[in-house]
């Protein structure tokens, strides 16, 4: 190994025997350590943010801005994974064959796309109401509002693993609560900058119609898979 500073050949170690400069292996180790420390700090910040939102959901969410973008993305992905995971585990326990793609992967993608679409509808409603909010800020706040409902879905998964029937009631509360409570909560959190061009009530009604159509498509997908699973 040659020192990158003075060119002296060395048999190894952390530093050059001649000039004392750090050898490349040490730099790589430091970079890995820095990456690990950054990941640990990010996880700590996410956990702290989640706890603060769970303690005071609306107050914390309405103060959330673009600085929580990563937390919003993590929450959205986690929310999208939980329901398909429950159904995949449910079908896997039976005697029939289970399609990982149809039961878990595709619904997860549908959930992610739906959440993006739901936020896009809310963002559009805010814009036509005259709010000068950025997409990054509104998306981060949307992810913050998802946190309590993601916690409910985690609770549903916990009871599901304990084989209790109440898990599906909790699941319904988490899903219906998220899809029908977040839009008015989001719109209300920006009411201080409302310019009165379009009333929030009408925006909420349109968003609810889109949600109902999407719910119908998701239910039809799972009903088809259930019949396919039972028949084949």
UniProtKB/Swiss-Prot annotation:
One Gene Ontology term, aspect cellular component: plasma membrane
Keyword set, alphabetical order: Cell membrane, Membrane, Transmembrane, Transmembrane helix
Transmembrane parts of this sequence: 69-91, 104-126, 139-161, 166-188, 200-219
Location in or out of the cell: Cell membrane
Protein topology in the membrane: Multi-pass membrane protein
S-S bonds: none
Membrane keyword on record: yes
Keyword Transmembrane: yes
UniProt-recorded name of the protein: Uncharacterized protein YvbI
């Amino acid at each position: 190994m040659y020192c990158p500073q003075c060119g002296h050949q060395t048999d190894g170690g952390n530093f050059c025997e001649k000039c004392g400069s750090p050898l490349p292996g040490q730099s790589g180790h430091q970079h890995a350590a820095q990456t690990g420390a950054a990941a640990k700090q990010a996880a700590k910040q996410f956990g702290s943010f989640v706890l603060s939102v769970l303690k005071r959901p609306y107050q914390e969410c309405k103060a959330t801005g673009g600085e929580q973008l990563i937390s919003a993305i993590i929450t959205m992905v986690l929310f999208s994974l939980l329901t398909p995971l429950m159904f995949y585990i449910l079908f896997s326990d039976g005697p029939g064959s289970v399609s990982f793609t149809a039961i878990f992967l595709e619904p997860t993608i549908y959930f992610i796309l739906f959440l993006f679409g739901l936020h896009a509808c809310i963002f559009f409603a805010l814009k036509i109401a005259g709010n000068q909010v950025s997409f990054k800020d509104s998306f981060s706040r949307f992810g913050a509002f998802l946190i309590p409902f993601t916690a409910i879905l985690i609770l549903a998964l916990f009871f599901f693993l304990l084989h209790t029937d109440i898990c599906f009631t909790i699941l319904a509360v988490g899903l219906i609560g998220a899809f029908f409570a977040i839009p008015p909560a989001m719109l209300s959190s920006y009411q201080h900058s409302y310019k009165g061009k379009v009333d929030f009530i009408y925006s909420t009604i349109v968003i609810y119609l889109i949600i109902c159509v999407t719910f119908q498509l998701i239910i039809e997908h799972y009903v088809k898979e259930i019949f396919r699973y039972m028949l084949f």
